[in-house]
Structure formats: structure tokens, C-alpha cells
Swiss-Prot record:
Oligomer and partners: Heterodimer of LeuC and LeuD.
Species whose genome carries this gene: Pseudoalteromonas translucida (strain TAC 125)
Family annotation (Gene3D superfamilies): Aconitase, domain 3 (3.30.499.10)
CDD domains given in the database record: IPMI
Annotated keywords: 4Fe-4S, Amino-acid biosynthesis, Branched-chain amino acid biosynthesis, Iron, Iron-sulfur, Leucine biosynthesis, Lyase, Metal-binding
Entry cofactors: [4Fe-4S] cluster
Encoding gene (name): leuC
GO molecular function: 3-isopropylmalate dehydratase activity; 4 iron, 4 sulfur cluster binding; metal ion binding
Root EC class: lyase
Protein name: 3-isopropylmalate dehydratase large subunit
Family label: Belongs to the aconitase/IPM isomerase family. LeuC type 1 subfamily.
NCBIfam families per record: leuC, PRK05478.1, PRK12466.1
């Protein structure tokens, strides 16, 4: 019987069937950070349990760290306590930790792939919803809650109900200056934030095959924003070239043998999906969210929707509420709204390709006076590479702040927060009310779009910048 990629990974990791809908799965990799792990470790200690597979558990500091300093003292008292607890827990239970003194420290979903921890065909979990990022490698990866973090630490297993399968076919290739961020935002705009609920999505087609690994990570990162349990892209030569030589990837003959197995992990011809969606890549333009949900998104040259023209009364009310919070008017273009802050970073867009795209836009230009502009690399390795390539110098010369790695302004859990009423062009993944700070107004965009907003003071069509 023909199988999807999801079917194959699920079957390979099923230890036992709990009932007709639920199986017990083996977990290959467990990623840990300071926010969702303290209670899990405390639970182990209370029950006198050990970590079953510390060699398959990897930790980093990311959510609460200061991006202005590598000192623990730069974090708030609560954040510092969580960071210190992670350090103590990893030492006690024998877990690899990339702390603030390590060049490998970074956002967990940047660190995992660049270390070769993320591999095709594996099951990966983390106490963070954007674990879907790792699906770009053909891995089944998703977020879990703190009680499940404890369970995986103790057993290296997880009970899961198998989801339905969703195929998202991208025909043709994206146009120049249109990125994977624009693609996934367009998909979310089409399906809505509940369109993927109950599904694991597989992205395929020429438009996906043409993407780099970093672009694929951006795409899968926001699978959760359309409600999907996980996002998958079958591995290929681009994947294998990315992984070869990375610290935790197989080496030599073992790598060659792994590739032979990974090449079998593709959806079979004739395999049936529960739902199929198709998009033409060439029809997608640079995207911007205008509201307070990732599905409230428009193309850069489109107008903000009018609630009076929306036949769905619930959607119309949602539009009115979002317009009020965002301080916008229906029928306007977003170029009329001035930007106060620009944030380029997060697990969605803080990799070297993202920084190169932003630097290309800002080189030789200046950030508009009064705009706070932050560049926060996703890891110490990304930071060093950007500095070696001269990108950091370009950003600093333009007036950007060049920060240390961390989750930063993606979420208001550290000192990088958006002020009330301030409008931010952000390369992060969520634009909910208060996500970046109480009263803050978030517009999700690609790195190039964010960079262009910094030097113009408002959103512009970057197709005219290239």
C-alpha cells in the first residue's frame, strides 16, 4: 500500500498501539530550553527518576536571555533563575547544554539543525510550538507541553494520536524578492489559522524543491500558524549537502548509509492525502500582515480589507477589532503607516541567508531617524559568520543595533519589548495582541521587507528595491 512520508515516519517509530487512534511513539531527539523545562526536571527529581537518554537530549538558552550582554546578570531576576535552573538541571542529569558562553548557543530551532541534531526520518519534540521548523529535514517534529517534556525525559516515548494528512502543492517557482516567508504567509492567508488543524502538512512541488534548507525551515516554522500539528518536506540532495560534516550528523560510511535510507523517505506515488491544496508560486507577492492574526495578511500592493464588504459576520467583527487595535483604516495601503521599530530575528528568520537578504537592502543606506532597528542573529555561529562576511558592519553603519543571539523581540519574555502603540516590522511568526509587548502593533514580513521599512520609515514594495 502506498504511503505518505508521514505514514512512513510514524510507522517506523510506533512501539505499541494504545487504541485505534493512539500509538506510543519512540522519540529520537528532545530539545530543551529554560522556559518549559524547570517543572519537568522537578517532576523527575520528585519521583526519583533519571533522564532515560541524555545523549538524545540537547539544551540551549534562548527565550529569556539578554541580547545586549552574555552575562546572566543582564537578565531579569525571573529569567536569571530559569537560566540558572537549566544549567543546574543539565549538569545533574548529564545533558548537553549550550549556555551563554558557548558559540553554539542560540535559538533552539536554529541550533538544532546547524549542529546536525536534526536529521531526516527522526521524531523530534521540544516544549515550544515552533518545533515544526525541523520538519524541513523530513523529520516529524512538533511542540509538546511541560508534562510531556517530563514524560519524554523519563521514557524517550510519547503517546500520540495520528493526525490526518494535508498536501500543500506549490507549482512553479517564486519570483525574485519573494521568499519562503511570503510563501507561508500566503498559504496561511488562504487556509486561515485553523485550516491545518488536525493535520500534518507535507509541502511539495517545484516551488518547494527550489528552496534552500534555510528557506524550508522558515516555511515549516510557521506550519503551526495555520493550525497544523507539523510541517514536512521530503529530504533531498539539498538536505544532505547541508547536513554533511555537521557535529552530530553521521560521518563517512555511516553518512552514506544514512543517505541511502533517507532517500526512501518520500511519499509514494499514488499515496492518498486527506486534503490537498495547490498554489501557484508565481502569483505570490511580498506579504505583510495588517491585523492581529497571521491569517490577516495582504500583498504589499493590496489594500487593507473593509469589514463592511465581508459577508461573514464573525470575520467582519474580527476585522473591525484588528483595525482598532492596529490603528489602521480599511481601504488604505500599509505604506501609509509609519514604522517605529524594526526587528530582524526569531526562529523564523535569523539565519545567515536572512541576514544577507537584509544587508543587501540596507547597504550604503541609513535607518530613518527615530526608528529602533534590531538585528538579532539566531545563534553564536550565525553571528560569527555574519561578522566574518562583513554583514554586521553593514548593519551597524546603517544604524541597526547588532545584538547577541536569542529569541529577543519575538515575544515579550525578555527585555526586548515593543512599547504600547508602537508599530513594528517584524520577521517573527506571530502578530497577536501584545505578543511583542503590551499594546504593541506587529506586522509580520520577510527580512528584506523589514530592512526596507527601516530605511524608508514605512513599508515599501521591495520589488522596486532590487
Amino acid at each position: 500500500m502506498a504511503q505518505t512520508l508521514y505514514d512512513k515516519i510514524w510507522q517506523a517509530h510506533t512501539i505499541a498501539s494504545i487504541n485505534e487512534q493512539t500509538d506510543l511513539l519512540y522519540i529520537d531527539r528532545h530539545l530543551v530550553h529554560e522556559v518549559t523545562s524547570p517543572q519537568a526536571f522537578a517532576g523527575l527529581r520528585e519521583k526519583n527518576r533519571t533522564v532515560r537518554c541524555p545523549e538524545k537530549t540537547f539544551a540551549t538558552m534562548d527565550h529569556n536571555v539578554s541580547t545586549k550582554s552574555r552575562s546572566l546578570d543582564a537578565a531579569s531576576e525571573v529569567s536569571k533563575n530559569q537560566l540558572m535552573a537549566l544549567d543546574a538541571n543539565c549538569k545533574e542529569f548529564g545533558i548537553v547544554l549550550y549556555d551563554l558562553n558557548s558559540i553554539n548557543q542560540g535559538i533552539v530551532h536554529v541550533m538544532g539543525p546547524e549542529q546536525g541534531i536534526t536529521l531526516p526520518g527522526t521524531t523530534i519534540v521540544c516544549g515550544d510550538s515552533h518545533t515544526s521548523t525541523h520538519g524541513a529535514f523530513g523529520a516529524l517534529a512538533h511542540g509538546i507541553g511541560t508534562s510531556e517534556v517530563e514524560h519524554v525525559l523519563a521514557t524517550q516515548t510519547l503517546q500520540q494520536k495520528k493526525a490526518k494528512s494535508l498536501k500543500i502543492q506549490i507549482n512553479g517557482r517564486l519570483r525574485p524578492t519573494v521568499t519562503a516567508k511570503d510563501l507561508i504567509m500566503a498559504v496561511i492567508g488562504k487556509l486561515g489559522t485553523a485550516g491545518g488543524t488536525g493535520y500534518v502538512a507535507e509541502f511539495c512541488g517545484e516551488g518547494i524543491e527550489a528552496l534552500s534548507m534555510e528557506a524550508r525551515m522558515t516555511l515549516c516554522n510557521m506550519s503551526i500558524e495555520m493550525g497544523a500539528k507539523a510541517g514536512l518536506i521530503a529530504s533531498d540532495q539539498i538536505t544532505y549537502d547541508y547536513l554533511k560534516g555537521r557535529p552530530f550528523a553521521p560521518k563517512g560510511a555511516d553518512f552514506d548509509a544514512a543517505v541511502k535510507y533517507w532517500e526512501t523517505l518520500k511519499t509514494d506515488d499514488g499515496a492518498q492525502f486527506d486534503h490537498v491544496v495547490e498554489l501557484e508560486a508565481s502569483s505570490i507577492q511580498p506579504q505583510i500582515t495588517w491585523g492581529t492574526s497571521p491569517e490577516q495578511v495582504i500583498g504589499v500592493d493590496e489594500c487593507i480589507p473593509d469589514p463592511d464588504k465581508e459577508p461573514d459576520l464573525i470575520k467582519a467583527d474580527a476585522i473591525r477589532s484588528a483595525l482598532k487595535y492596529m490603528g489602521l483604516k480599511a481601504g488604505e495601503k500599509l505604506s501609509s503607516a509609519k514604522v517605529d521599530t524594526v526587528f530582524i530575528g526569531s526562529c523564523t528568520n535569523s539565519r545567515i541567508e536572512d541576514l544577507r537578504a537584509a544587508a543587501k537592502i540596507v547597504e550604503g543606506k541609513k535607518v530613518v531617524a527615530g526608528i529602533e532597528a534590531l538585528i538579532v542573529p539566531g545563534s553564536g555561529l550565525v553571528k560569527k559568520q555574519a561578522e566574518d562576511e562583513g554583514l554586521a558592519d553593514i548593519f551597524k553603519a546603517a544604524g541597526f543595533e547588532w545584538r547577541e543571539p536569542g529569541c529577543s523581540m519575538c515575544l515579550a519574555m525578555n527585555d526586548d519589548r515593543l512599547g504600547a502603540g508602537k508599530r513594528c516590522a517584524s520577521t517573527s511568526n506571530r502578530n497577536f495582541e501584545g505578543r511583542q509587548g503590551r499594546g504593541g502593533r506587529t506586522h509580520l514580513v520577510s527580512p528584506a521587507m523589514a530592512a526596507a521599512a527601516a530605511i524608508h520609515g514605512h513599508f515599501v514594495d521591495i520589488r522596486g528595491e532590487a
